[in-house]
């Protein structure tokens, strides 16, 4: 009886440990971002690289944290038209392969009315900018964006920033969708619904 109880305890422990594995992330080409917790956020396969949205939200230039995301903008870039606001998508990109690969440069947001937004590219002085990492060349083997031990990786979102000027009306035309296109083959794409 003691052996049966011990065996039952081991089986229960093994089942509990397997439930704790990171199966909450699924590799897909379409998915729904699961909100601020990142729980169940999809790993988006785009060519050889894997993209994961960490957070997406409106940005307030008057907020201290958000102001740091808006550094490195020219006066023309900083100007919002009436009915526009800042929107940020924070993501991580992983190269799990043994060779370098180019990260995507076409990452757009679209709404249900087919409005399409392209990211604003800040100067390299913006330490959170996705482009700071992605435009510097291929992503090394076994590397990630943002690189470890950088301001972006150690920041509150732990992701590299894609910065958009978005029409406020698009926030009503949800869901917003992030669309990622492989830089070498435009037929390879992935998309994720964004949290607002």
Regions found by a protein language model. Name each.
Residues 20-196:
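Conserved functional micro-motifs across diverse proteins
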Residues 15-19:
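C-terminal motif of bacterial Sec signal peptides marking the signal peptidase cleavage site
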Residues 1-7:
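Bacterial N-terminal signal peptides that target proteins for export
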């Amino acid at each position: 009886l003691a052996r049966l109880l011990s065996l039952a305890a081991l089986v229960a422990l093994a089942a509990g440990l397997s439930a704790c594995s990171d199966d909450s992330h699924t590799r897909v080409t379409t998915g729904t971002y699961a909100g601020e917790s990142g729980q169940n956020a999809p790993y988006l396969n785009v060519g050889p690289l894997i993209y994961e949205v960490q957070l997406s939200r409106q940005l307030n230039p008057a907020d201290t944290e958000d102001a740091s995301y808006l550094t490195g903008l020219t006066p023309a870039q900083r100007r919002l038209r009436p009915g526009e606001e800042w929107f940020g998508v924070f993501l991580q990109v992983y190269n799990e392969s043994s060779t370098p690969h180019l990260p995507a440069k076409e990452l757009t947001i679209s709404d249900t009315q087919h409005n399409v937004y392209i990211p604003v590219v800040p100067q390299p002085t913006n330490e959170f900018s996705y482009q700071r990492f992605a435009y510097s060349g291929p992503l090394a083997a076994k590397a990630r964006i943002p690189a470890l031990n950088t301001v972006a990786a150690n920041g509150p979102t732990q992701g590299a920033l894609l910065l958009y000027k978005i029409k406020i009306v698009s926030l009503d035309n949800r869901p917003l969708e992030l669309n990622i296109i492989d830089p070498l083959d435009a037929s390879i794409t992935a998309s994720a619904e964004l949290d607002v």
